[in-house]
């Protein structure tokens, strides 16, 4: 991994204490998205990791609603593969499959179109950030319902203190940046 590129990406992540609620340190990726050089570096770093780890044996990138959509298509293009969308409930037309996951105060659902993938296709899930792992686990469940193979989950940022990586079990996980 290119250390200068990684530092370029890291410098574009801002921290906001007590947002959205007291006691939370929010990691903001907006400056990264505003800077095309930094954004390109983040895509290049993620793609380089996936190329070296999976040697071209990826069929699709699955971008998670909503900020995974910012990275999914660019990452898919860099790898020369397609991109499928995993959306919040009620946002996709046609027949869908759904999976629930817990939120701090309730639950939410993700959906994927039933014809998004064929059984056995190899998929990498991408999101901007991994916190508790609930969204990523629900996405894995959806892809398992389609009998696709989740080869890895990736994100730009990982909040290690929330132990989301552990919830993924045996599924490999990679992040560019780790924060407590």
Swiss-Prot record:
<dbReference type="InterPro" id="IPR029057">
    <property type="entry name" value="PRTase-like"/>
</dbReference>
<dbReference type="GO" id="GO:0016208">
    <property type="term" value="F:AMP binding"/>
</dbReference>
<comment type="pathway">
    <text>Purine metabolism; AMP biosynthesis via salvage pathway; AMP from adenine: step 1/1.</text>
</comment>
<dbReference type="InterPro" id="IPR050054">
    <property type="entry name" value="UPRTase/APRTase"/>
</dbReference>
<keyword id="KW-0660">Purine salvage</keyword>
<feature type="modified residue" description="Phosphothreonine">
    <location>
        <position position="135"/>
    </location>
</feature>
<comment type="subunit">
    <text>Homodimer.</text>
</comment>
<keyword id="KW-0328">Glycosyltransferase</keyword>
<feature type="modified residue" description="Phosphotyrosine">
    <location>
        <position position="60"/>
    </location>
</feature>
<dbReference type="GO" id="GO:0005737">
    <property type="term" value="C:cytoplasm"/>
</dbReference>
<feature type="modified residue" description="Phosphoserine">
    <location>
        <position position="66"/>
    </location>
</feature>
<feature type="modified residue" description="Phosphoserine">
    <location>
        <position position="15"/>
    </location>
</feature>
<protein>
    <recommendedName>
        <fullName>Adenine phosphoribosyltransferase</fullName>
        <ecNumber>2.4.2.7</ecNumber>
    </recommendedName>
</protein>
<dbReference type="Pfam" id="PF00156">
    <property type="entry name" value="Pribosyltran"/>
</dbReference>
<dbReference type="GO" id="GO:0006168">
    <property type="term" value="P:adenine salvage"/>
</dbReference>
<keyword id="KW-0808">Transferase</keyword>
<keyword id="KW-0007">Acetylation</keyword>
<comment type="similarity">
    <text>Belongs to the purine/pyrimidine phosphoribosyltransferase family.</text>
</comment>
<dbReference type="InterPro" id="IPR005764">
    <property type="entry name" value="Ade_phspho_trans"/>
</dbReference>
<dbReference type="InterPro" id="IPR000836">
    <property type="entry name" value="PRibTrfase_dom"/>
</dbReference>
<dbReference type="GO" id="GO:0006166">
    <property type="term" value="P:purine ribonucleoside salvage"/>
</dbReference>
<comment type="function">
    <text>Catalyzes a salvage reaction resulting in the formation of AMP, that is energically less costly than de novo synthesis.</text>
</comment>
<dbReference type="GO" id="GO:0044209">
    <property type="term" value="P:AMP salvage"/>
</dbReference>
<keyword id="KW-0597">Phosphoprotein</keyword>
<feature type="modified residue" description="N-acetylserine">
    <location>
        <position position="2"/>
    </location>
</feature>
<dbReference type="GO" id="GO:0003999">
    <property type="term" value="F:adenine phosphoribosyltransferase activity"/>
</dbReference>
<dbReference type="GO" id="GO:0002055">
    <property type="term" value="F:adenine binding"/>
</dbReference>
<feature type="modified residue" description="Phosphoserine">
    <location>
        <position position="30"/>
    </location>
</feature>
<feature type="modified residue" description="N6-acetyllysine">
    <location>
        <position position="114"/>
    </location>
</feature>
<keyword id="KW-0963">Cytoplasm</keyword>
